[in-house]
Structure formats: structure tokens, C-alpha cells
């Protein structure tokens, strides 16, 4: 992998998959900001989607497409400059948790054996 943002993301996922091939990994895209950098954010999101497609059990949490735009108006209530304030972190945590819940409920067989990952235990009903 090249020494680029995406190359290094690939290295990280490869390393995690080397440690535990059955690990479930969630990759999160950035939120749009409602300004000129949104084009770059959309590009990053599309490349991260490709990265997820390269690995088993690697899921995209596409905040670029599905989260509110983190624009100046939103930062008035939920931000401290660029980063969220405590209320913003709480709201973001709820978004991520709900998105993960959606992914799990949409792929129940892929998550049914989670308690056994990293062990020699198996559930005969699942492969």
C-alpha cells in the first residue's frame, strides 16, 4: 500500500484482519460541512467505500450521505470551532450507535457469531 491516506487506511485494516480475520470493522466517513471542501469529503467517502469492499466484514458508516451537514449553523449549537462540543459528541455518538444498529439488523447472520470471534467456540447453526 502506498504511503497515502488511503494506503495507510488499507494497512490499518490489513493489520486488524491479520490479528483477527473475522473481526467486524466499521469505517466512518466525514460529515459534509456545507462549504468548498465538500467535494473532497465526497471523494474521501467514495474511496473509503471502495476500501470497505476490499475486506470481508468491513462496513461503511456513510456519514457523508446520511448525517446532517456540519455547517456554521449546526456548529453554533453543537461545535467548539471545528470539533464538536459535549452536546455535539453526544449527538454524534447517537448517530454512530444507531447506524451500527442498522448495519447489524440488516446483516443478522454476519453478526450472529460475534461472541465467538477470537475463540475456538463455534455455533453449529452458523458457518
Give the residues covered by each predicted segment:
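Catalytic His-Asp segment of secreted/periplasmic serine-dependent ester chemistry enzymes
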Residues: 32-127
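Active-site segments of SGNH/GDSL-like serine hydrolases
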Residues: 12-45
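Oxyanion-hole/transition-state-stabilizing segment in secreted/luminal serine hydrolases
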Residues: 1-6, 31-33
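Amphipathic, non-transmembrane alpha-helical secondary structure
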Residues: 3-10, 14, 90, 94-97
Amino acid at each position: 500500500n502506498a504511503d497515502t491516506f488511503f494506503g495507510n487506511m488499507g494497512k490499518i485494516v490489513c493489520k486488524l484482519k491479520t490479528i483477527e480475520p473475522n473481526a467486524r470493522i466499521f469505517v466512518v466517513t466525514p460529515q459534509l460541512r456545507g462549504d468548498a471542501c465538500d467535494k473532497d469529503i465526497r471523494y474521501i467517502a467514495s474511496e473509503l467505500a471502495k476500501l470497505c469492499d476490499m475486506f470481508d466484514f468491513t462496513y461503511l458508516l456513510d456519514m457523508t450521505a446520511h448525517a446532517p451537514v456540519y455547517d456554521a449553523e449546526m456548529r453554533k449549537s453543537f461545535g467548539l470551532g471545528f470539533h464538536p462540543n459535549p452536546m455535539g459528541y453526544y449527538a454524534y455518538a447517537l448517530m454512530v450507535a444507531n447506524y451500527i444498529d442498522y448495519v447489524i439488523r440488516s446483516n443478522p447472520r454476519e453478526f450472529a457469531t460475534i461472541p465467538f470471534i477470537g475463540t475456538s467456540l463455534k455455533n453449529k447453526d452458523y458457518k
